[in-house]
């Protein structure tokens, strides 16, 4: 046994016990005194004499005191565990906030990487478009002058006009395609509406037939009900007649029995009793038959009424369905009207589009004739394209390499996103663990409150017991068995080990999250370095594209000069022809004019031909950019067309 002893001052008559501590100062000095004090004897108003001491009550008090002591120990341990859990929670919350911040930073960096990747892709696409638009011409050009800038501006305006015309054509084609699609959709809707209307009309006819059949069945059921009621009334009348006859027979038999009793012949009485029993049996059988007939009649009436109610419900449902079908037919008619209106509008738009398409076909035929003339001239310029093709191939290979690098960056960004998601999942797991720890802390708090309440109740009980006893001084001993002491110590060790295990698990999770975040940061740094390399590569590609644009502009300036020379030559030739014609007309005499007048027609025809040639050359000037773009299908890369008389440089 384990004993704890202490002493109390003689001046303290009533002990003051603090909550959470055990008062070791006892009012007795020996075990016998304790047994005498804490026995069954208690002071009462009726019997001031002490009762015989009970040793069980003293043992109960000792057990309660030991339980109080152990509860206080457990309370202290729980408080320590609570403090540890709160510290762990605060650490985990701070680590959670830090990890959330890191995740947000990582997401921002990923977004920046994606934006830079998109910008790099856009830059590469722009470079490709510039390369595709670039025309061949590997020529050393002199310093730009005012004339060249004007020529380039005029060429740009012509190209813009051509592009606007192409855009208008594309818009018209798109509109025509959309109108055709709407027309087909409208026609399909009309056909579907017709089919639906046919189906609904067939359904309406079927429903009408069903309604007529139901009405006939309802009338038949009504007739059957009336007949059944008549038969029921007849059966009831017959049963009443039979009952009256049975009652009359019973009365007659009763009278006969009374008369026979008066006569009192024993043998005859026995016979009458036998007859009475037989009549009673027959009456019982008849009553049973009556009851069965009534039950069958009631069942038949109930069945007929149920069938009537079901027929009425079906009739009401059919009426409602007929109304809904009529509403559907009306709505379908309205939709048909709307579809017809839309169909008429679509036909009007189609007529307008067909007229516009006819005009466009005429323009296309003219442009095709001009294209055929230009194709014959463009065959001369293929030799000058080879050098430019080499440079363009190099630039395209570089752009493809940049694209591949961009795709690699995309894949890396996707991997980083996956890693970020895994980090998010790890954070969520840690949050779950934290929540579990918080729940455990709350449970510990609840246990603490329960233990405090128990301690308060036990302390109140002990105070009451102490106040009831006398103020004798003595020694107090708290006894515990070895098994209880060992079990309590084992519990304390188990609780300590569990707390340490939980703390270690939380720390391991936090370290794993930190390691994953460090890995993601390293990968982000590597991706940023690769993005910088990509930016440098794209800048080089843009520089090369700018060089190609400069070469293109130089080629276009020289083409413009050659065209202006040809135009000047054509205008000079036209003016010479006109001057010669006027001189011939002035030199001829008046009598010869009558005979030579019909010969002036070919001169006028020549003048008209020269004018048309000049006009055709002027018309060919704005159409050159369109010709260059259209010729890309025949030649691998675009080439500038040359007018007759021009030489490839």
Swiss-Prot record:
Pfam families assigned to the protein according to its UniProt record, in alphabetical order: WEMBL (PF05701)
Compositionally biased spans, kind Basic and acidic residues: 443-453
Family indicated by similarity: Belongs to the WEB family.
Keywords: Coiled coil
GO BP term (any one): cellular response to mechanical stimulus
GO cellular component terms listed in the entry, alphabetical order: plastid
Organism: Arabidopsis thaliana
Region called Disordered, residue ranges: 443-483, 583-611
Protein name: WEB family protein At5g55860
Coiled-coil blocks: 59-227, 267-356, 391-461, 505-549
Ranges annotated as biased composition (Low complexity): 468-482
Compositionally skewed regions (Polar residues) per UniProt: 456-467
């Amino acid at each position: 046994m384990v004993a704890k002893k202490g002493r109390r001052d003689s001046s303290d008559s009533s002990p003051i016990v603090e909550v959470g501590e055990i008062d070791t100062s006892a009012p007795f000095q020996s075990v016998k005194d304790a047994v005498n004090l804490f026995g069954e004897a208690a002071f009462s108003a009726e019997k001031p004499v002490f009762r015989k001491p009970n040793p069980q009550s003293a043992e109960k008090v000792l057990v309660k005191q030991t339980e109080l002591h152990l509860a206080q120990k457990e309370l202290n341990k729980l408080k320590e565990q609570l403090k540890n859990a709160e510290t762990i929670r605060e650490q985990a919350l701070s680590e959670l906030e830090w990890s959330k911040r890191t995740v947000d930073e990582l997401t921002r960096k990923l977004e920046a990487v994606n934006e830079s990747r998109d910008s790099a892709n856009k830059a590469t696409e722009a470079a490709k478009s510039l390369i595709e638009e670039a025309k061949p011409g590997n020529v050393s050009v002199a310093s730009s002058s005012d004339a060249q800038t004007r020529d380039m501006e005029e060429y740009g305006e012509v190209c813009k006009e051509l592009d606007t015309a192409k855009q208008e054509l594309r818009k018209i084609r798109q509109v025509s395609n959309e109108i055709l699609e709407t027309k087909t959709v409208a026609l399909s809707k009309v056909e579907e509406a017709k089919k639906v209307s046919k189906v609904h009309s067939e359904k309406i006819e079927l429903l009408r037939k069903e309604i007529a059949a139901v009405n006939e069945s309802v009338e038949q059921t009504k007739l059957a009900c009336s007949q059944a009621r008549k038969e029921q009334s007849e059966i009831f009348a017959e049963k009443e007649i039979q009952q009256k006859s049975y009652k009359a027979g019973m009365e007659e038999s009763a009278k006969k029995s009374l008369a026979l009793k008066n006569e009192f012949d024993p043998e005859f009485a026995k016979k009458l009793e036998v007859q009475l029993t037989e009549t009673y049996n027959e009456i019982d059988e008849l009553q049973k038959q009556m009851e069965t007939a009534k039950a069958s009649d009631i069942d038949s009436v109930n069945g007929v009424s149920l069938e009537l109610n079901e027929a009425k419900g079906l009739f009401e449902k059919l009426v409602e369905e007929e109304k809904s079908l009529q509403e559907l037919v009306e709505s379908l008619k309205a939709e048909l009207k709307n579809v017809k209106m839309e169909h008429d509008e679509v036909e009007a738009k189609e007529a307008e589009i067909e007229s516009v398409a006819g005009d466009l076909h005429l323009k296309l035929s003219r442009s095709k004739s001009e294209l055929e003339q230009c194709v014959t001239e463009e065959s001369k310029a293929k030799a000058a394209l080879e050098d430019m093709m080499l440079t363009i191939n190099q630039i395209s290979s570089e752009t493809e390499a940049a694209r591949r690098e961009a795709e690699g960056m995309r894949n890396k960004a996707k991997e980083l996103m996956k890693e970020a998601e895994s980090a998010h999942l790890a954070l969520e797991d840690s949050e779950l663990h934290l929540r579990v720890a918080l729940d455990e802390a709350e449970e510990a708090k609840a246990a603490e409150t329960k233990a405090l309440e128990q301690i308060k109740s036990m302390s109140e009980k002990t105070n009451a017991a102490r106040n009831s006893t006398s103020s004798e001084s003595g020694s107090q001993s708290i006894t515990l068995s070895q098994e209880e002491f060992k079990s309590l110590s084992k519990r304390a060790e188990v609780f300590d080990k569990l707390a340490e295990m939980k703390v270690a698990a939380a720390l391991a999770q936090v370290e794993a999250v930190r390691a994953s975040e460090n890995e993601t940061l390293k990968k982000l740094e590597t991706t940023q370095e690769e993005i910088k390399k990509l930016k440098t590569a794209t800048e080089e590609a843009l520089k090369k594209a700018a060089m190609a644009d400069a070469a293109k502009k130089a080629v276009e300036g020289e083409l413009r000069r050659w065209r202006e020379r040809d135009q000047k030559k054509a205008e000079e030739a036209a003016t010479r022809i006109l001057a010669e014609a006027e001189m011939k007309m002035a030199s001829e005499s008046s009598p010869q004019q009558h005979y030579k007048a019909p010969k002036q027609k070919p001169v006028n025809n020549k003048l008209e031909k020269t004018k048309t040639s000049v006009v055709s050359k002027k018309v060919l000037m704005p159409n050159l950019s369109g010709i260059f773009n259209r010729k890309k299908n025949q030649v691998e890369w675009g080439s500038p067309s040359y007018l007759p008389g021009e030489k490839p440089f």
